[in-house]
């Protein structure tokens, strides 16, 4: 569990082991990892996966506020002992420049179909608060770059859309390979857009060449503010769910897109739409 505002936004992450008895207090967690310094917001995002291909599940943590919001991502290997501070992480990856918010979002999945789980990090403020946004893919190839600019793949947003604010991975075309989904909730006057990048051997480097683009219903909806994936109709295939927190004066909406061979390009034609209770 992340607590990014702990101790003047230094941030903390808490691990609770599934040992038959979960503690009711964060202070009694099995492992507590502290951020590096105030303002880092360590714990702003979390993901898990086997990031060094040793058969054990590791932890990735974002700290979007690190160094004037340049941002950092940390990987902690499951090697028998977790450090007490982020500064002692096994891998540290630093964003490109101030106010990029690198580490605001993290997801994981095998994005080059080599059988190993890769790390994906979003920086919705890139470049330096202009907020076009970028998404960085780091392949699990035995050596992670320490700088975001040296990622294996970089996908760039446009038009101050805050691309990379939310990320999720899942097989959304039922071909047996994990695909990448990223949002730009501020697109087109905060209407919002969600982009699907299929794992077909070549991931594009700009949102303009995404395999599927889904656009929100109207301005100021923030479509894509949140993303998740799962089998929501029990057909054995992974579907996509998208949140739009500001729909109808912050009433909010959630949209489900079934993995049925054709994902629509507009939120209004989602397979399921769930509307919040009140403004």
Predicted regions and their residues:
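Conserved beta-strand/short-helix segments
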Residues: 1-279
């Amino acid at each position: 569990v992340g607590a990014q505002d702990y101790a003047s936004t230094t941030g903390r992450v808490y691990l609770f082991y599934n040992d038959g008895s979960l503690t009711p207090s964060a202070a009694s967690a099995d492992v507590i990892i502290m951020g590096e310094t105030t303002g880092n917001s360590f714990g702003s995002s979390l993901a898990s996966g086997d990031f060094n291909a040793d058969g054990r599940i590791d932890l990735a943590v974002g700290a979007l506020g690190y160094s004037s919001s340049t941002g950092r991502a940390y990987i902690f290997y499951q090697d028998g002992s977790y450090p007490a501070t982020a500064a002692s992480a096994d891998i540290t990856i630093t964003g490109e420049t101030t106010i990029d918010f690198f580490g605001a979002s993290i997801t994981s999945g095998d994005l080059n179909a080599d059988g190993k789980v890769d790390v994906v990090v979003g920086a919705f403020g890139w470049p330096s608060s202009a907020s076009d946004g970028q998404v960085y893919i780091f392949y699990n190839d035995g050596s992670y770059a320490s700088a975001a600019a040296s990622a294996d793949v970089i996908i760039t947003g446009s038009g101050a859309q805050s691309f990379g604010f939310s990320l999720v991975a899942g097989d959304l075309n039922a071909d047996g390979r994990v695909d990448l989904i990223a949002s730009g909730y501020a697109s087109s006057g905060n209407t919002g857009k969600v982009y699907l990048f299929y794992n077909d051997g070549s991931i594009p480097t700009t949102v303009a060449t995404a395999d599927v683009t889904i656009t929100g219903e109207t301005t100021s909806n923030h479509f894509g503010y949140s993303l998740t994936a799962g089998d929501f109709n029990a057909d054995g295939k992974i579907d996509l769910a998208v949140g739009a927190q500001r729909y109808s004066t912050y009433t909010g909406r959630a949209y489900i897109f079934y993995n049925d061979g054709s994902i629509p390009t507009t939120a209004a034609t989602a397979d399921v739409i769930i509307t919040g209770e009140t403004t």
